[in-house]
């Protein structure tokens, strides 16, 4: 079952920029950068993608490698615990290869410093030996492209961030774009889906393709059990309501956060640490997963004194301000 799921996940990923839906400005610019690099016969400039989880950072890196006709090596910041881990990867890269580092903001400082000469000069500085007898050896690397992905660009050090030639932000997707993504995924998965069914799932997907595809799978389960010929708006609405996903895509935790903020703290302001304790949730989870969409919807405000619920949040929760 796990292997089947992984195959489905891989098959629904766009392979080219033409297949990729949304992020129009980013795609247009990336197309230019790719074409220019191919024309010069050089590796692409190092690229940093940042934005909320599930918006397509990994997919874009895979598309870059495919369009350039090079291999892609994947790793993540937390995995690179020692400088030797990164050095081993860098020395094995072929000419023009793409190294993708997810959660690059979580790389240890010692590992990060190994990247500086590698990114600028395609050289690796290694220290051989210890104490007075230690010496530095320079190793030439093949030209490569580093693609970093992060949900928290503010946690990247300036020296690392400034070494990226291309820095692009991924935005939340519109409901119309998500409906197109849902229709594309449904076609690949062999799910019969009506136009209004796609729209219903798209508008409840929190502006995020990963969530849209996940909701489609769960709605498909309901359609299968109910022996429905197609996923309609009515079926999708009923299934998502049973999953505690409301008409704007807010789930149980979103509503709990707003409810606690309004009922326990009179709408705020309240510090995020206090709010996290009251919601029995991690601070980072609130900041990375829940807050961005609530702010995007206009339900939550960040102020110097803490988080505040907006009048729109009171109305959505059917509570009096």
From Swiss-Prot:
Any GO BP annotation: DNA repair
Sequence positions that bind DNA: 302, 307
Residues that bind ATP: 12-13, 54, 57-59, 120-122, 163, 173, 210
Record region (Head domain (RuvB-H)): 247-321
Location(s), subcellular: Cytoplasm
Record's catalysed reaction(s): ATP + H2O = ADP + phosphate + H(+)
Positions of disulphide bridges: none
Chain positions covered by the region annotation Small ATPAse domain (RuvB-S): 174-244
Record carries keyword ATP-binding: yes
UniProt-listed CDD domains: AAA
Gene Ontology molecular function: any one: four-way junction helicase activity
Predominant localisation class: cytoplasm
Pfam families the UniProt entry points to: AAA_lid_4, RuvB_C, RuvB_N
EC number per UniProt: 3.6.4.-
InterPro entries found in the cross-reference section: AAA+_ATPase (IPR003593), AAA_lid_4 (IPR041445), DNA_helicase_Holl-junc_RuvB (IPR004605), P-loop_NTPase (IPR027417), RuvB-like_N (IPR008824), RuvB_C (IPR008823), WH-like_DNA-bd_sf (IPR036388), WH_DNA-bd_sf (IPR036390)
Chain's role: The RuvA-RuvB-RuvC complex processes Holliday junction (HJ) DNA during genetic recombination and DNA repair, while the RuvA-RuvB complex plays an important role in the rescue of blocked DNA replication forks via replication fork reversal (RFR). RuvA specifically binds to HJ cruciform DNA, conferring on it an open structure. The RuvB hexamer acts as an ATP-dependent pump, pulling dsDNA into and through the RuvAB complex. RuvB forms 2 homohexamers on either side of HJ DNA bound by 1 or 2 RuvA tetramers; 4 subunits per hexamer contact DNA at a time.
Subunit structure: Homohexamer. Forms an RuvA(8)-RuvB(12)-Holliday junction (HJ) complex. HJ DNA is sandwiched between 2 RuvA tetramers; dsDNA enters through RuvA and exits via RuvB. An RuvB hexamer assembles on each DNA strand where it exits the tetramer. Each RuvB hexamer is contacted by two RuvA subunits (via domain III) on 2 adjacent RuvB subunits; this complex drives branch migration. In the full resolvosome a probable DNA-RuvA(4)-RuvB(12)-RuvC(2) complex forms which resolves the HJ.
The record's note on its domains: Has 3 domains, the large (RuvB-L) and small ATPase (RuvB-S) domains and the C-terminal head (RuvB-H) domain. The head domain binds DNA, while the ATPase domains jointly bind ATP, ADP or are empty depending on the state of the subunit in the translocation cycle. During a single DNA translocation step the structure of each domain remains the same, but their relative positions change.
Protein name: Holliday junction branch migration complex subunit RuvB
Biological classification of the source: Bacteria, Pseudomonadati, Thermodesulfobacteriota, Desulfovibrionia, Desulfovibrionales
Gene: ruvB
């Amino acid at each position: 079952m796990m292997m089947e799921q992984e195959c489905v996940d891989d098959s629904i990923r766009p392979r080219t920029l033409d297949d990729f839906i949304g992020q129009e400005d980013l795609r247009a610019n990336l197309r230019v950068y790719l074409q220019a690099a191919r024309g010069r016969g050089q590796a692409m400039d190092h690229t940093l993608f940042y934005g909320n989880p599930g918006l397509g950072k990994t997919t874009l890196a895979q598309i870059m490698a495919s369009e350039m006709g090079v291999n892609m090596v994947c790793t993540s910041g937390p995995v690179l615990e020692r400088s030797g881990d990164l050095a081993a990867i860098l020395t094995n890269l072929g000419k023009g290869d793409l190294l993708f580092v997810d959660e690059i903001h979580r790389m240890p400082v010692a590992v990060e410093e190994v990247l500086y000469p590698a990114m600028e000069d395609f050289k690796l500085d290694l220290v051989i030996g210890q104490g007075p007898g230690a010496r530095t050896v320079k190793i030439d690397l093949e030209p490569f492209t580093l693609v970093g992905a992060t949900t928290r660009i503010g946690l990247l050090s300036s020296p690392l961030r400034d070494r990226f030639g291309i820095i692009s932000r991924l935005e939340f997707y519109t409901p119309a774009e998500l409906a197109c993504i849902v229709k594309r995924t449904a076609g690949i998965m062999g799910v019969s889906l009506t136009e209004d069914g796609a729209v219903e799932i798209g508008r409840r997907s929190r502006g995020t393709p990963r969530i849209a595809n996940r909701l489609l799978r769960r709605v498909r389960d309901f359609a299968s059990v109910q022996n429905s010929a197609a996923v309609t708006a009515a079926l999708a609405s009923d299934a998502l309501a049973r999953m505690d996903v409301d008409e704007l895509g807010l789930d149980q935790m979103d509503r709990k956060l707003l409810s606690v903020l309004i009922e326990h703290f009179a709408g705020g302001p309240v510090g995020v640490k206090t709010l996290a304790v009251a919601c029995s949730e991690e601070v980072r989870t609130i900041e990375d997963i829940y807050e961005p969409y609530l702010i995007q919807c206009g339900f939550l405000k960040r102020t110097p004194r803490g988080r505040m619920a907006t009048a729109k949040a009171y109305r959505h929760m059917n509570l009096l301000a």
